[in-house]
UniProtKB/Swiss-Prot annotation:
Signal peptide: none annotated. This is Transcriptional regulator dmxR14. One of its GO terms (molecular function) is DNA binding. Its main location: nucleus. The gene is dmxR14. It comes from Cryptosporiopsis sp. (strain 8999). CDD domains: GAL4.
């Protein structure tokens, strides 16, 4: 029985092939020209079964079937029509679903498999609903038409050059900030840097898709790392507030002199710093502090010229009452004038205050001399820089001048003003002492 069945199957094969050849020959059409005329590229008389031209030459006249362009219908048929019907029905069901219609515009192309990248699912609520369903998963037949196998060269991303460290200890806020800069949205469920042991691999994969981050900071001129400038500004603020307090109330000269001496020592300590010695900003602030100290010296020198307090005047009058001069006439008693007593006492105190201030001005003189030498060294240094840059040092305003700094001429003018103020104060005090 088995041999008979095999024989019948073998016999049926050529019958089918003969039938298909007959059908093909019936559907095909003979050429208009014979093969000999077509090869010679001449016009054929189109006589059948043999044309007159072939008979005259004695060649064999053959008419072949014409070959039409295009594919044949028999070869285009699917070998498995049932599978094609199943795939078509699944496509139709997915297109009719509301989730598919809502995500057609936002659905990106497949990125990569899990073996190549950790970011296969985009961060989108509508897309997430499609992937969660068993019918709409990536493994469903509706994704068979898409090729999900990509090589590493399909998505070439620039390397990351970021100044911060992407360590697994960062919180989710950093991940959200990274999602904003990524070329496509990322899923937080796929990036578990802080809770999963594969955080480092996630970071390395994420670094491959981040765009290149280059610092855009502009070069800045040299800034000293010390806090001398900030300390000098605080001292200048303190002296300014103290000057306002001196103008509102009567402060004794010894207190002002002690505060000025302490301020001078602070400035000397700041000027001894090697980091800010060549910077023009601290030198300018030091000059302003020196002017404020001279202003307080002037206030201390003329403090007693404003008159004494009422209780001090009464005490002075009581002491001077012992010097009452009584004339020989009992009816006439001459008492010293109250204004003359106060004036004499004020002059004595003013002279003492002026002498104290004049004795303390040598500290200020030493400070001004040190400031002047620093300004001169700074001017020489700036001159050498300009000579190197511009080829000459006679002009600061032309060419490539120094960025964010005072010129040497400005510092020299400030130093000259400080020295003139010191000279004027000492001259006024000496003149006042000579007059009294």
């Amino acid at each position: 029985m088995e041999e008979a069945e095999t024989n019948t199957q073998v016999d049926s094969v050529p019958s089918n092939s003969v039938r298909s050849g007959a059908e093909l020959s019936s559907k095909s059409k003979l050429r208009d020209s014979c093969h000999a005329c077509a090869r010679s590229k001449v016009r054929c008389p189109k006589q059948k079964p043999s044309c007159s031209r072939c008979e005259a030459r004695g060649t064999t006249c053959q008419y072949f079937f014409s070959r039409r362009p295009g594919r044949r219908r028999e070869t285009s048929k699917s070998p498995n029509p049932e599978k094609q019907i199943a795939i078509g029905s699944s496509h139709a069901n997915n297109r009719n679903s509301p989730s598919f219609s809502s995500t057609r515009s936002t659905l990106p192309s497949p990125i990569a498999s899990d073996s190549n990248s950790n970011f296969t699912q985009p961060q989108n609520s509508s897309i997430t609903t499609v992937h969660n369903g068993p019918e709409n998963s990536i493994e469903s037949p509706c994704w068979e038409d898409f090729s999900c196998e990509f090589s590493d060269t399909d998505f070439v991303m620039p390397t990351i050059d970021t100044p911060f460290d992407l360590s697994p200890a960062y919180s989710g806020s950093v991940v959200q900030e990274m999602n904003d800069t990524a070329p496509f949205p990322l899923s937080s469920s796929r990036i578990s840097m802080g809770t999963t042991p594969s955080g480092k691999s996630s970071i390395s994969s994420y670094s491959q898709i981040l765009p290149s981050i280059t610092p855009t900071t502009t070069p800045v001129a040299h800034i000293s790392s010390c806090r001398c400038l900030a300390t000098a500004l605080d001292l200048l603020k303190t002296l300014s507030l103290a000057g306002l307090a001196d103008a509102d109330s009567l402060v004794s000269a010894p207190i002002i002199l002690a505060e000025n001496k302490q301020s001078i020592e602070s400035v000397n300590n700041l000027m001894a710093c090697p980091l800010c010695s060549g910077d023009s900003f601290p030198l300018t602030i030091f000059s302003m502090i020196a002017l404020k100290i001279l202003e307080r010296y002037a206030v201390a020198a003329r403090t007693q010229h404003q008159g004494t307090r009422p209780q001090e005047a009464e005490g002075t009058v009581e002491i001077k009452l012992a010097d009452i001069v009584i004339s020989n006439n009992e009816d006439q008693t001459r008492l010293p004038s109250h204004s003359n007593i106060v004036c004499c006492d004020d002059k004595t105190q003013a002279r003492a205050a002026a002498q104290l201030v004049l004795g303390e001005l040598h500290h200020m003189q030493r400070l001004v001399n040190q400031l002047s030498s620093m300004i001169k060294r700074s001017a020489e240094r700036d001159g050498r820089k300009l000579e190197i840059l511009n080829g000459y040092n006679d002009s600061i305003d032309s060419g490539n001048s120094m960025l964010a700094s005072f010129s040497a001429s400005t510092l020299e003018l400030v130093e000259s003003d400080v020295r003139k103020s010191l000279r004027s104060l000492s001259t006024d005090i000496i003149k006042e002492l000579r007059q009294h």
